[in-house]
């Protein structure tokens, strides 16, 4: 890097050094933005789902042991029509009701996510550990996790919203590398 003379001489104009110019911008972007531009950022939604009495809306992603990629959870959003509890779990078992397909947020990109997905209403089974439990009021929710929850190969992340007699949605966003 060039060392610039920081002292002005009386016969010259005031010294300036332009930074963040159009030809050399100094712009910072989030990891989400970089992952999206690289075709490695994904979205998964349950859409609006009616939850029967005494059940939960469940969404799960499984990162297979041999996938070769690590999942970093960017954010978790959604909504509910009544008071509920949002719980994020490590592990657990969701009986397959449907297998929603993750969408690459670089629209038109053919890169596919390595995760296996499961969605259903019911109760989470198997062995699991709660990471976070958040009481919700009716309305929208949004958690910016900024990659702070990591799902390495061979691990599972499960999310539940409930319990029942309401309509809810879960939207999960992550990047893979």
What kind of region is each of these model predictions?
Residues 1-15, 20, 27-177:
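Beta-strand-centric surfaces of beta-sandwich/beta-rich domains
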């Amino acid at each position: 890097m060039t060392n610039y003379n920081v002292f002005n001489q009386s016969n010259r104009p005031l010294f300036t050094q332009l930074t963040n110019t159009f030809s050399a911008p100094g712009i910072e972007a989030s990891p989400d933005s970089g992952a999206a531009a690289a075709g490695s950022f994904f979205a998964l939604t349950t859409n609006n789902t009616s939850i029967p009495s005494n059940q939960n809306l469940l969404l799960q992603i499984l990162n297979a042991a041999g996938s070769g990629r690590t999942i970093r959870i960017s954010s978790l959003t959604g909504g509910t029509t009544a008071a509920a509890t949002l719980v994020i779990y490590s592990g657990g078992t969701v009986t397959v009701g449907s297998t929603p397909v993750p969408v690459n947020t670089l629209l038109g990109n053919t890169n596919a996510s390595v995760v296996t997905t499961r969605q259903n209403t019911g109760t989470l089974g198997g062995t699991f550990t709660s990471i976070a439990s958040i009481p919700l009021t009716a309305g929208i929710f949004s958690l910016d996790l900024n990659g702070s929850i990591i799902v390495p190969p061979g691990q599972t992340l499960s999310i539940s919203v409930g319990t029942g007699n309401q309509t809810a949605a879960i939207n999960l966003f992550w990047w893979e590398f």
